[in-house]
Amino acid sequence: MTRLSAAPFLSIACIAAIAAVTLPGCGKPEYCAKKTEFNSSVTTLTSVSLTPPDPTEINTDITNVQNAGTAMINAAQSDFPSQSTALENAVNDVVATGKTLTTSKDLTATGITLAAQLLTLNSAWNSFKTATNDACS
């Protein structure tokens, strides 16, 4: 390469290197970015409401947990297999119970089961957060 043709290449390479260093989240695993979305979906699902729960809303919230969880778990599976598997199992249990909820009467019948599963989900989520904290900070 001649001196004139190398200059634009080097300029582009320098800009790319600077951008890679200064962009937030660069160098962090993919699951780190996905933790925020999953946390938000779990918080929405487990938030206490003063109005009677609507099975349709609950199922929408469960679907959001499932979608965000699947993306995050798939990204973390190779680095944190036991925590990912525990979280995946907890999400799957909540999803399976959610599929049985079509009326408020269904919610009354399965409310205790769902509440216990949400506690398990929260525990698995806390373990996952603890395990991935160093990689994501």
Each PLM stretch: what is its role?
Residues C26-T70:
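Immediate post-signal-peptide N-terminus of mature secreted/exported proteins
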Residues P24, E30, T132-D134:
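Extracellular secreted precursors and ectodomains with disulfide-bonded cysteine-rich loops/domains
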Residues A124-S137:
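Short, low-complexity, Pro/Ser/Thr/Gly-rich segments in the mature regions of secreted, periplasmic
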Residues M1-P24:
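Sec-dependent bacterial lipoprotein signal peptides
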